[in-house]
């Protein structure tokens, strides 16, 4: 998986035990700040040029999903984790796909310079990093640490929650952990 690698229709490449990371880029952000483009540049992801190129059965990270990502989804992770790179201001343009497993990330804080400290406004690389940890692929997630200078701060801000989410048995337990955490910070 090098720079410029592009997925063909329905293809997902698993290297060893690694989860394929797939980017669908709507080219809406500043290319110099775009974490999706950096993931592609550093060989951390492959690009799906069209929605048709997104592998069937893959996990699509979606803010509109009805289920939270959990370790139980690791079976779908083998088909890939897909991040749709578009700006939060254009979130209504988020595509709805069939034949994929839409999952929402649980409560996490952004650590990137644009949205630092904002809950649930992660950039594409933060979303993938969190997904890999929740799905039990810590070693693969470590590959992101040296490529994004905010990554250690992301782990500092969210480490305990990520560990709790990664130890949950299913989506409902992830949601319970999330809700307990949110209740604890409200009081």
Which stretches of residues belong to each language-model region?
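Short, extreme N-terminal leader segments that mark the start of a protein/domain
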Residues: 1-46
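Active-site cofactor/cluster-binding pocket
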Residues: 32-38, 43-123, 127, 134-163, ...
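Extended aliphatic helical segments
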Residues: 6, 14, 19-23, 60, ...
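Long, charged alpha-helical interface segments
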Residues: 160-187
């Amino acid at each position: 998986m090098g720079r410029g690698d592009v997925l063909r229709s329905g293809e997902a490449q698993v290297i060893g035990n690694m989860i394929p990371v797939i980017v669908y880029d709507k080219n809406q952000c500043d290319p110099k700040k775009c974490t999706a483009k950096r993931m592609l540049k550093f060989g951390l992801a492959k690009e799906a040029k069209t929605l048709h190129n997104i592998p069937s059965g893959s996990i699509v990270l979606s803010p509109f999903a009805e289920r939270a990502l959990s370790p139980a989804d690791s079976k779908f992770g083998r088909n890939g984790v897909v991040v749709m790179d578009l700006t939060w201001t254009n979130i209504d343009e988020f595509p709805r796909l069939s034949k994929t497993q839409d999952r929402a990330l649980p409560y996490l804080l952004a650590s990137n310079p644009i949205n630092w400290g904002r809950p649930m406004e992660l950039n594409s690389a933060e979303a993938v990093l969190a997904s890999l940890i929740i799905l039990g692929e810590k070693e693969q997630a470590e590959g992101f640490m040296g490529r994004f200078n905010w990554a250690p701060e992301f782990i500092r801000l969210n480490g305990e929650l990520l560990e709790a989410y990664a130890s949950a048995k299913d989506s409902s337990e992830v949601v319970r952990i999330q809700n307990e955490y949110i209740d604890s910070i409200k009081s």
